[in-house]
Amino acid sequence: LILGQLQPDEGSVKLGTKLEIAYSDQLRGKLEPEQNLIDNVCGGQEFIELNGKRRHAISYLGDFLFSPERVRTPVKALSGGEQNRAILARLFSKPANLLVLDEPTNDLDIETLELLEDILLSFDGTVILVSHDRDFMDHVVTQLLILRGDGTVEEQAGGYSDWEARGGRLVEPETRVQQMPASKPETPAPVAASPASTA
Protein backbone atom coordinates (compact mmCIF):
# COMPACT_ATOMS: atom_id res chain seq x y z
CA LEU A 1 0.00 0.00 0.00
CA ILE A 2 2.79 2.44 0.89
CA LEU A 3 4.54 1.72 -2.41
CA GLY A 4 1.32 2.12 -4.39
CA GLN A 5 1.56 -1.44 -5.72
CA LEU A 6 -1.76 -2.39 -4.10
CA GLN A 7 -4.95 -0.47 -3.53
CA PRO A 8 -6.76 -0.69 -0.18
CA ASP A 9 -9.92 -2.81 -0.04
CA GLU A 10 -11.50 -0.05 2.03
CA GLY A 11 -10.59 3.50 2.95
CA SER A 12 -7.60 5.31 1.54
CA VAL A 13 -3.86 5.69 2.05
CA LYS A 14 -2.48 9.20 2.51
CA LEU A 15 1.23 9.75 2.04
CA GLY A 16 3.12 12.89 2.98
CA THR A 17 3.78 15.33 0.16
CA LYS A 18 7.55 15.29 0.80
CA LEU A 19 7.81 11.52 1.08
CA GLU A 20 10.63 10.01 -1.00
CA ILE A 21 10.62 6.21 -0.96
CA ALA A 22 13.48 3.86 -1.84
CA TYR A 23 12.51 0.20 -2.11
CA SER A 24 14.53 -3.00 -2.28
CA ASP A 25 12.88 -6.39 -2.58
CA GLN A 26 14.27 -9.88 -2.10
CA LEU A 27 15.27 -10.01 -5.78
CA ARG A 28 17.15 -6.70 -5.30
CA GLY A 29 16.88 -5.60 -8.90
CA LYS A 30 19.33 -6.56 -11.56
CA LEU A 31 22.68 -5.01 -12.35
CA GLU A 32 23.82 -4.75 -15.96
CA PRO A 33 26.60 -7.38 -16.14
CA GLU A 34 28.54 -5.74 -18.99
CA GLN A 35 28.55 -2.30 -17.36
CA ASN A 36 31.04 -1.25 -14.70
CA LEU A 37 30.20 -0.11 -11.16
CA ILE A 38 30.09 3.61 -11.94
CA ASP A 39 27.67 2.99 -14.82
CA ASN A 40 25.44 0.70 -12.73
CA VAL A 41 25.41 2.73 -9.53
CA CYS A 42 25.96 6.32 -10.65
CA GLY A 43 24.53 6.23 -14.17
CA GLY A 44 28.02 6.72 -15.61
CA GLN A 45 28.32 10.14 -13.96
CA GLU A 46 31.56 11.23 -12.33
CA PHE A 47 29.60 12.99 -9.56
CA ILE A 48 26.33 12.15 -7.86
CA GLU A 49 24.18 14.24 -5.56
CA LEU A 50 23.37 12.82 -2.14
CA ASN A 51 21.22 14.74 0.33
CA GLY A 52 21.91 17.99 -1.50
CA LYS A 53 25.68 17.43 -1.54
CA ARG A 54 27.78 16.60 -4.56
CA ARG A 55 29.99 13.50 -4.16
CA HIS A 56 32.57 12.02 -6.47
CA ALA A 57 31.44 8.58 -7.66
CA ILE A 58 34.73 6.94 -6.65
CA SER A 59 34.48 8.40 -3.15
CA TYR A 60 30.86 7.28 -2.83
CA LEU A 61 31.68 3.74 -3.98
CA GLY A 62 34.55 3.74 -1.48
CA ASP A 63 31.90 4.01 1.25
CA PHE A 64 30.73 0.59 0.03
CA LEU A 65 34.23 -0.89 0.30
CA PHE A 66 35.18 -0.58 -3.38
CA SER A 67 38.74 0.47 -4.17
CA PRO A 68 39.27 3.05 -6.95
CA GLU A 69 40.68 0.23 -9.09
CA ARG A 70 37.42 -1.79 -8.86
CA VAL A 71 34.95 0.94 -9.88
CA ARG A 72 35.64 0.43 -13.61
CA THR A 73 35.30 -3.36 -13.34
CA PRO A 74 32.39 -4.94 -15.25
CA VAL A 75 29.77 -6.25 -12.83
CA LYS A 76 30.06 -9.77 -14.27
CA ALA A 77 33.65 -9.90 -12.92
CA LEU A 78 32.61 -8.98 -9.35
CA SER A 79 32.11 -11.51 -6.57
CA GLY A 80 28.62 -12.13 -5.21
CA GLY A 81 29.40 -10.03 -2.13
CA GLU A 82 30.64 -7.16 -4.29
CA GLN A 83 27.50 -7.34 -6.42
CA ASN A 84 25.36 -7.15 -3.27
CA ARG A 85 27.33 -4.08 -2.14
CA ALA A 86 26.81 -2.53 -5.58
CA ILE A 87 23.06 -3.06 -5.28
CA LEU A 88 23.09 -1.38 -1.84
CA ALA A 89 25.17 1.50 -3.23
CA ARG A 90 22.62 1.99 -6.01
CA LEU A 91 19.71 1.89 -3.53
CA PHE A 92 21.28 4.46 -1.21
CA SER A 93 22.31 6.74 -4.10
CA LYS A 94 18.66 7.71 -4.57
CA PRO A 95 17.11 10.47 -2.47
CA ALA A 96 14.86 8.96 0.20
CA ASN A 97 13.42 9.64 3.61
CA LEU A 98 11.64 6.27 3.76
CA LEU A 99 13.35 2.96 3.03
CA VAL A 100 11.25 -0.15 2.48
CA LEU A 101 13.41 -3.28 2.59
CA ASP A 102 12.18 -6.84 2.00
CA GLU A 103 14.54 -9.45 3.51
CA PRO A 104 17.60 -7.21 3.05
CA THR A 105 20.05 -9.68 4.64
CA ASN A 106 19.43 -12.55 2.20
CA ASP A 107 22.70 -13.69 0.59
CA LEU A 108 24.85 -11.02 2.27
CA ASP A 109 28.37 -11.84 3.42
CA ILE A 110 29.42 -10.69 6.91
CA GLU A 111 31.25 -7.62 5.62
CA THR A 112 28.23 -6.43 3.61
CA LEU A 113 25.82 -7.22 6.46
CA GLU A 114 27.87 -5.06 8.85
CA LEU A 115 27.97 -2.30 6.23
CA LEU A 116 24.18 -2.44 5.85
CA GLU A 117 23.73 -2.24 9.63
CA ASP A 118 25.98 0.84 9.80
CA ILE A 119 24.13 2.54 6.93
CA LEU A 120 20.71 1.87 8.46
CA LEU A 121 21.79 3.09 11.90
CA SER A 122 22.95 6.38 10.40
CA PHE A 123 20.03 6.74 7.94
CA ASP A 124 18.20 10.02 8.54
CA GLY A 125 14.67 8.81 7.92
CA THR A 126 12.33 5.91 8.52
CA VAL A 127 13.06 2.30 7.65
CA ILE A 128 10.40 -0.35 7.27
CA LEU A 129 11.89 -3.77 6.85
CA VAL A 130 10.55 -7.28 6.61
CA SER A 131 12.99 -9.81 7.99
CA HIS A 132 13.32 -13.21 9.59
CA ASP A 133 16.90 -12.36 10.63
CA ARG A 134 16.42 -11.94 14.38
CA ASP A 135 20.01 -10.88 15.11
CA PHE A 136 19.88 -8.20 12.41
CA MET A 137 16.61 -6.85 13.84
CA ASP A 138 18.16 -6.69 17.31
CA HIS A 139 20.94 -4.51 15.89
CA VAL A 140 18.93 -2.04 13.80
CA VAL A 141 15.29 -1.73 14.91
CA THR A 142 13.56 0.16 17.68
CA GLN A 143 10.07 -1.17 17.06
CA LEU A 144 8.51 -4.42 15.80
CA LEU A 145 5.26 -5.04 14.01
CA ILE A 146 4.46 -8.76 14.26
CA LEU A 147 2.03 -9.82 11.55
CA ARG A 148 -0.14 -12.70 12.71
CA GLY A 149 -1.71 -15.32 10.46
CA ASP A 150 -5.19 -14.19 11.52
CA GLY A 151 -4.62 -10.68 10.13
CA THR A 152 -3.85 -8.98 13.44
CA VAL A 153 -0.75 -6.87 14.00
CA GLU A 154 1.10 -6.71 17.31
CA GLU A 155 3.24 -3.63 17.95
CA GLN A 156 6.19 -3.85 20.34
CA ALA A 157 9.04 -1.52 21.31
CA GLY A 158 12.59 -2.80 20.89
CA GLY A 159 14.10 -5.59 18.84
CA TYR A 160 13.28 -9.26 18.54
CA SER A 161 15.07 -10.30 21.76
CA ASP A 162 13.19 -7.60 23.69
CA TRP A 163 9.89 -8.93 22.39
CA GLU A 164 10.89 -12.51 23.17
CA ALA A 165 11.96 -11.51 26.72
CA ARG A 166 8.46 -10.10 27.26
CA GLY A 167 6.98 -13.50 26.38
CA GLY A 168 6.56 -13.01 22.63
CA ARG A 169 6.63 -16.17 20.57
CA LEU A 170 6.11 -16.93 16.92
CA VAL A 171 3.95 -19.93 16.12
CA GLU A 172 5.94 -22.53 14.21
CA PRO A 173 4.52 -23.34 10.74
CA GLU A 174 3.54 -26.94 11.68
CA THR A 175 1.67 -25.71 14.77
CA ARG A 176 -0.01 -22.94 12.81
CA VAL A 177 -1.34 -25.42 10.22
CA GLN A 178 -2.78 -27.63 12.97
CA GLN A 179 -4.47 -24.64 14.65
CA MET A 180 -6.06 -23.23 11.48
CA PRO A 181 -9.42 -24.43 10.18
CA ALA A 182 -9.13 -26.36 6.90
CA SER A 183 -10.93 -23.63 4.93
CA LYS A 184 -8.32 -20.94 5.67
CA PRO A 185 -5.09 -20.89 3.63
CA GLU A 186 -1.83 -20.93 5.56
CA THR A 187 -0.39 -17.45 5.95
CA PRO A 188 3.25 -16.94 6.88
CA ALA A 189 3.98 -14.85 9.96
CA PRO A 190 6.77 -12.52 8.81
CA VAL A 191 8.24 -10.08 11.25
CA ALA A 192 8.23 -6.44 10.18
CA ALA A 193 10.53 -4.06 11.97
CA SER A 194 10.65 -0.30 11.98
CA PRO A 195 13.49 1.86 13.35
CA ALA A 196 13.26 5.01 15.39
CA SER A 197 11.82 7.84 13.38
CA THR A 198 8.42 7.88 11.75
CA ALA A 199 7.32 9.22 8.37
Where are these regions (language model features)?
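ABC ATP-binding cassette signature C-motif
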Residues: 1-199
